[in-house]
Amino acid sequence: MVAGCGAMGIIVPVYCRAHLYCIPLFSMTGILLIISISLLSIYCVLLIYYCVGWAVVPNYAMLNPQHTVSITIIIPARNEEKNLPALLDSIDHQTYSKEFFQVLVIDDHSTDNTANIASQYPFVTCLSLKDFIGSDSLNSYKKKAIETGIKNSVGELIVTTDADCIVPAKWLATIAAFYHQYKPEFMVMPVAINCTAKPIEIFQALDFMSLQGITAASVHKKLHSMCNGANLAYTRKAFEAVDGFTGIDTIASGDDMLLMHKIAQQYPAGIHYLKSKNVIVQTAPVHSIAAFLNQRIRWASKADKYDDKRIMAVLFLVYFLNVMLLLIPVLSLVSGQWSVVLYWLLLLAVKTIVELIFLFPVATFFHKRPLLWAFPLAQPFHILYTVIAGWLGKFGSYNWKGRNVK
């Protein structure tokens, strides 16, 4: 390899298949390549750190089941008549004694049969959110639903899940045993997407699984805040000590991560990750590209509200790396610098390989290794959606359960 100077600046020729390609390093594409290589290098180091973090999270084995911890399960529900029965049936089959847990379904202004379905289960108390709030429009009905549930609960430990989820039989028993043993204030637990063979569902399952692996590693290593409201547990004491959702109640989403950060600030040693197959909550995928983008835009909308600067740094790194990887092939084709595409493919290959190294043990834990064949094929689409969802999460709006939110 030889470097020289040309009219456009430094030229780096690359020999490939008997052709000599020259890329002006100080051209737009050359600068983007340098930035992308730098960002990708940092990203790979971070993923290796996550990989080590995942490996050292202990697999929790429930040796002595505890049936004395008082638990309240809070389920916010809006128009969930199709999904709610499966969740409540799975809760009905818990090995944990019903004497020690309470189930509250908070009906968030449903226009379907959600409330009637919930009321058919004798162990469920259904509360109507409209009985507890005024007629004023809110920006976060879900936080208000959870807050209402907590105010009407009796449990020492609050457990939250979503109405479109299914929980395993030993879910509560394992949570109670872990809580009894370690006395955490906030417990983060695994969630998996229950997908079919449809490409959009496989894509979601892979994307979500990567987030779950990062969640476990970051929580255990105390690198930054990350969790999912479909499977959380926290003490009533901690929720009340941080004054609940006060200060974040005007933000549309964030009933999970924003609350986690508030509790972590007051109880830095009280945040634990419960890694056990007994507590993997299965959640339903969305069934269209439009619904998927809408969901991810909703998730991205809270990004600039995080007080945790560490997660902000990670999000910026990932977002701008994907922006660079999207711009490089576009600019190379526009400018006619076809050789840059070879570098782009190399960057994609490195990114994909490092991500697969990280994902393999995570997929093993979630019993989703057969899905990994699709991961390289999904890479370009993942880059595109990350850029779109990140931008619209900041500057656009989204629809949630028939409500338009900005």
Describe these PLM feature segments:
Residues Y179-Q212, K237-E240, T246-I311:
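Catalytic donor/gating beta->alpha subdomain of glycosyltransferases that bind UDP-sugars
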Residues D107-A115, D131-I133, C165:
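A conserved acidic beta->alpha catalytic loop
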Residues V69-T72, Q102, L258:
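Cell-envelope/extracellular polymer assembly enzymes that use nucleotide-activated donors
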Residues I158:
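Short aromatic/hydrophobic "clamp" motif used to bind/position activated sugar donors
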Residues P24-Q66, I202, L359:
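N-terminal membrane-anchoring/stem segments of glycan-assembly enzymes
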Residues N113, A163-F178:
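Acidic donor-binding/catalytic loop of UDP-sugar-dependent glycosyltransferases
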Residues D89-F100:
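Short, acidic, metal-binding catalytic loop of nucleotide-sugar glycosyltransferases
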Residues P65, I311-G396:
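Membrane-embedded multi-pass helical conduit in multi-pass membrane proteins
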